[in-house]
Amino acid sequence: MISDSKLLASAAWDAQSLNELKAKASEDPAANIRPVARQVEGMFVQMMLKSMRDALPKDGLFSSEHTRLYTSMYDQQIAQQMTTGKGLGLAEMMVKQMTPEQPLPEESTPAAPMKFPLETVVRYQNQALSQLVQKAVPRNYDDSLPGDSKAFLAQLSLPAQLASQQSGVPHHLILAQAALESGWGQRQIRRENGEPSYNLFGVKASGNWKGPVTEITTTEYENGEAKKVKAKFRVYSSYLEALSDYVGLLTRNPRYAAVTTAASAEQGAQALQDAGYATDPHYARKLTNMIQQMKSISDKVSKTYSMNIDNLF
């Protein structure tokens, strides 16, 4: 069996590594399920990073063939680090689905093989990851989220995963709070000139904030009663800056310690309300409803397909 450390120490996406893994998997498929799953998870992460890079302008002042080469190598290193240890959870999910001793629950949807061979990944490596997934995943699950919501989750899902790994805040809680505070990105706080503030989490501009601010009318609760008040909120240059500031706010402030150590997203939601993040007395319940909705959709997607090691090679 090939160890994870050996795979990660090598050039994990070169042909030699894949051929070696293919040979080992053919000899003993059951013993090599985990390294195969790790390899596939790594390729998915690298493809996501590449899709993000492709969306950026390529004619900047510091853009050249050399910088693009170094960026590609850097992305490979990031992908390797992200899939080390627990990774993003994709590999573990595949291991559970491909291990006979751990069958899916009886009430799950009948499994349909996911037609996603390795040749497809290699042949269409320049194709957007979302297009590949759309072709591979069956369409017979009940998706109750509207289109704008799905686009919002797709944009923030990977950054939320990274922020969760760095801070300890459950990633479903990060997504749910961003969705609740911004109305799935459709009702986010605006600047005076109408431009977006990128303030996804409704963070107010307290006395120690030195950046730009915007003042809006918002709803606050006093003794359980809703009131309209004027309040100043922080303004960011991007969603990533907003996410970084949000994580820093929770990790640096001792009163949010229960949020960063919460065992589940639902417990984290209650910890946020207990710490006084929002004045809404129903804040935790609203977050929990969104968290459960997101988890339900994820479960329905995962139960509609299964992966077989023979179909990967």
Swiss-Prot record:
Disulfide bonds: none annotated. It comes from the Bacteria. One of its GO terms (cellular component) is periplasmic space. Its main location: periplasm. One of its GO terms (biological process) is bacterial-type flagellum assembly. The active site is at 220, 245. Keywords: Bacterial flagellum biogenesis, Cell wall biogenesis/degradation, Glycosidase, Hydrolase, Periplasm. Pfam families: Glucosaminidase, Rod-binding. It is found in: Periplasm. Its EC number is 3.2.1.-. Probably exported via the flagellum-specific export pathway. This is Peptidoglycan hydrolase FlgJ. It comes from Escherichia coli O157:H7. The lineage of its organism: Bacteria, Pseudomonadati, Pseudomonadota, Gammaproteobacteria, Enterobacterales.
